């Protein structure tokens, strides 16, 4: 019957020794105590587990092949993408392969940036790095990346990056995680708007 099928799936899936240890090690999220007096713990959903794991594998592959393409994950609204990014960030920071990487969390709206910044800044112990900073200007972004040799997690918006921006860093272990990345790659057609001051032409970010 169905209840027993679900129980069997959980026992064979979650409680397989190697997988259970993997979940226990990387997929139980908790905020720093000063930000969460109740010390609530959040355990991953199965899509978050497999997404974060496969993304890490894909990022490793992209470094080996020097493709610069770490992968794409599509998650519906409310599926917990911010926690998936948190699980992934923790695994990347702990990975010996990446040798203490620097991670950029990029969004396309300030409200998303504020939301992620609050969550990530309050999770330094879980992430495993004391430098978790929200970037509010291009100059600060440049200073932080050019002056850093390892580690650090930075939250910023896609608007901070422009074609005339100088080389920020040539390190191979800087990893970008972009939330809602598709929105900067669509609606590329020119939009014309007539205003009191004249004609305005706008394009999608990727134009």
Located regions from the model:
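A long, glycine-enriched binding/interface module in the latter
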Residues: 112, 121, 145-151, 159, ...
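Conserved motor-coupling elements within RecA-like helicase/translocase cores
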Residues: 135-154, 167-171
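Acidic/polar loop patches that form or flank catalytic/metal-binding clefts of enzymes
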Residues: 127-134, 184
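Hydrophobic positions in the central parallel beta-sheet of the AAA+
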Residues: 105, 154-156, 176
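Signature of the SF2 helicase/ATPase Hel1-core->accessory helical subdomain module
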Residues: 162-207
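Conserved helicase motor
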Residues: 110, 132-142, 157-163
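Short, flexible loop/turn elements at secondary-structure junctions
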Residues: 48, 77-78, 157-162, 180-182
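ATP-dependent helicase/translocase motor core
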Residues: 1-102, 111, 115-127, 149-153, ...
């Amino acid at each position: 019957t169905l209840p027993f099928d679900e129980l069997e799936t959980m026992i064979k899936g979650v409680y397989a020794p190697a997988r259970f240890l993997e979940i226990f090690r990387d997929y139980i999220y908790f905020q720093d105590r000063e930000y969460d007096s109740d010390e609530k713990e959040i355990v991953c959903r199965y899509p978050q587990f497999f997404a974060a794991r496969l993304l890490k594998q894909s990022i490793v592959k992209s470094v080996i092949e020097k493709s610069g393409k770490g992968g794409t994950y599509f998650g519906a609204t409310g599926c917990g993408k911010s926690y998936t990014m948190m699980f992934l960030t923790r695994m990347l920071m702990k990975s010996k392969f990446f040798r203490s990487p620097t991670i950029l969390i990029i969004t396309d709206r300030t409200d998303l940036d504020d939301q992620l910044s609050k969550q990530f800044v309050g999770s330094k112990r879980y992430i495993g790095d004391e430098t978790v900073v929200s970037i509010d200007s291009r100059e600060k972004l440049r200073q932080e990346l050019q002056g850093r040799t390892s580690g650090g997690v930075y939250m910023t918006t896609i608007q901070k990056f422009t074609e005339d921006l100088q080389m920020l860093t040539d390190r191979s272990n800087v990893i970008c995680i972009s939330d809602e990345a598709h929105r900067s790659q669509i609606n590329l057609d020119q939009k014309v708007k007539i205003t009191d001051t004249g004609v305005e032409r706008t394009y999608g970010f990727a134009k």
